[in-house]
């Protein structure tokens, strides 16, 4: 008879994870043709903050612009800097525009970039690419 309501059960499951923010971390930038996603993690890979162009309010073709990447990177870097991160390694993946502007914005936010690695997956002649657009 002493049964918890479903709302109380959901609150128990939705506990906020406690992530340790270290002075040195990682920034993962995923730049596709349609969007850009930026994740700031600690050295073990736990996400401290994340942002995307879509989350920042950009829609459609405006999501893959360098300005959208700049706004998303600013949001992410600000949360990480306030948490105590001062240095980072940057991992860039994907062919999209806005990769350089995101890195520049992270540096301007006060986080020193130690290394920049391009981890874009390259096929050894795998899947057939999409056909060329005809406008």
Curated annotation (Swiss-Prot):
The identity of this protein, by name, is Small ribosomal subunit protein uS11
Keyword annotations for this protein?
Answer: Ribonucleoprotein, Ribosomal protein, RNA-binding, rRNA-binding
An example molecular function term from Gene Ontology annotations: structural constituent of ribosome
Q: What Gene Ontology cellular component terms go with this record?
A: ribonucleoprotein complex; ribosome
Q: Which family does it belong to?
A: Belongs to the universal ribosomal protein uS11 family.
What Gene3D superfamilies would the database entry show?
Ribosomal protein S11 (3.30.420.80)
Which NCBIfam families does this one have? PRK05309.1, uS11_bact
Function description? Located on the platform of the 30S subunit, it bridges several disparate RNA helices of the 16S rRNA. Forms part of the Shine-Dalgarno cleft in the 70S ribosome.
InterPro entries assigned = Ribosomal_uS11, Ribosomal_uS11_bac-type, Ribosomal_uS11_CS, Ribosomal_uS11_sf
Q: What superkingdom does the record give?
A: Bacteria
Q: Name one Pfam family in it.
A: Ribosomal_S11
Q: How does it assemble?
A: Part of the 30S ribosomal subunit. Interacts with proteins S7 and S18. Binds to IF-3.
Q: Which GO terms describe its biological process?
A: translation
Question: Whose protein is this, by species?
Answer: Cytophaga hutchinsonii (strain ATCC 33406 / DSM 1761 / CIP 103989 / NBRC 15051 / NCIMB 9469 / D465)
Q: Which PANTHER family match?
A: 40S RIBOSOMAL PROTEIN S14/30S RIBOSOMAL PROTEIN S11
């Amino acid at each position: 008879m002493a049964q918890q309501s479903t709302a109380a059960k959901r609150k128990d499951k939705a506990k906020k994870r406690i992530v340790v923010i270290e002075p040195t971390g990682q920034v993962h930038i995923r730049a596709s043709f349609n969007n850009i996603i930026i994740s700031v993690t600690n050295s073990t890979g736990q996400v401290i903050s994340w942002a995307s162009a879509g989350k920042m309010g950009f829609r459609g073709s405006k999501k893959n612009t360098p300005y959208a990447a700049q706004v998303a990177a600013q949001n992410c870097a600000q949360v990480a800097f306030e948490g105590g991160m001062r240095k980072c390694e940057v991992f860039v993946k994907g062919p999209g525009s806005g990769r350089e502007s995101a890195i520049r914005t992270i540096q301007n936010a006060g986080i020193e970039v130690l290394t920049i690695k391009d981890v874009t997956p390259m096929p050894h002649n795998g899947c057939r690419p999409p056909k060329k657009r005809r406008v």
